[in-house]
Amino acid sequence: MLDILIQELIDKWQKYLVLQRNYSNYTVISYNNDLKNFLEFMNYYNSELVTINHIKNADIRLIRSWLAKRNYDNFTTSSIARGLSAVKNFYRFLEKTTQLNSHIIFSIKSPKKTKLLPKALSEDDVVVSLEHIEEYGNVKWVELRNKSLLVLIYASGLRISEALSITKLHLQNLEFIRIIGKGSKERIIPWLPIAKNLITQYLEILPYKLGDNEPIFRGKRGKKLQPQVFNRELIKLKHFYGLPQHLTAHSFRHSFASHLLERGAELRSIQELLGHKSLSTTQNYTKTSIKRLEAVYTTAYPIKK
C-alpha cells in the first residue's frame, strides 16, 4: 500500500515517460514494477508506510541494501541495473516537478551488465517462419496480420513496439517510414514493397475502421495488438516446426542486422537503420542519407524482390 501523494506522483511519472519521453508500454511497466519493489523495501526498512519525506531522505545505506537484497533474491545483473535506472529516473522526475534537490542516488553506479551477443536466426529459419506464420490465426485477417507484421519487422529491423505503432499515416509515403524510436530519436527506414503490399492487403480485409493516427495492427477484439500476444503466435510456430528456442519477434530484428552484414552491408548503415547510438559501446553512429540507405537495401537485402 502506498501513500496517496506518492501514488499520484507515480501516475504522473508514468504519463511523463509515455507522453514526453516516448517510452514503450513494456518499459513503463518494468520501471513501475522496479520502483514499487524499491518502495516496498523502503517500507520494510523503515517499518512504516513510506511518505515523500522517506523518499527524499533515503540514504546510500538504504539504496545499497535494496540492491544487495535483489542480488540475494537472484535477480540478474541486467535486472538489478534496470531497477536502479528506474529509481534514478523517478528521482530525476521528482527533481523536475518538486523541491527535491540533487540526491545521493545519482552517485551510485549501475552494476556492469554481462554483454550477450544478440542471437539471430538463420536465413532458412526466417524463410520457414515467413512461409508458415499465416497458419496461426484462425481467420484470414489475423493470418495476414501475423505475416505482414513479421515481414515488416524483418524487412525494416523495427523493434516490436515500433512496428505495433505503425499507423495509416506511415503508409502515405511511398519511399520510407519515419520512425520515432527510443529516447524520441527519429530515423528513416526505406519501405520494401513486400512489406507494404502485405500491409495493404491486410488493411483491405481488417474488420475494424481505423483513423489515420491509430495503430493498424489490431487484436481479435479490435484493440491495439500487444507484443506478448504476437509472441504467443510465434511460440506456436516455433514448437510445431522445431525452430530455435530464441525465436521471438525481437530475434527477427537481430536477424535483419546480421543478414545485411553477412551480405556486405556497411556497419554504419545498419547502425542507422536499427536506430542505435552505436553497434558497439564505443562507436557513435553517423547519419546516412535516404538514398544511401536505399542503396543498402538494393544491393544487400535478401527479400528485396
From Swiss-Prot:
The keyword Magnesium does not apply. The active site is at R159, K182, H250, R253, H276, Y285 (o-(3'-phospho-dna)-tyrosine intermediate). The keyword Transcription regulation does not apply. It holds the Pfam family Phage_integrase. GO terms for molecular function: DNA binding; tyrosine-based site-specific recombinase activity. Disulfide bonds: none annotated. Site-specific tyrosine recombinase, which acts by catalyzing the cutting and rejoining of the recombining DNA molecules. The XerC-XerD complex is essential to convert dimers of the bacterial chromosome into monomers to permit their segregation at cell division. It also contributes to the segregational stability of plasmids. This is Tyrosine recombinase XerC. The gene is xerC.
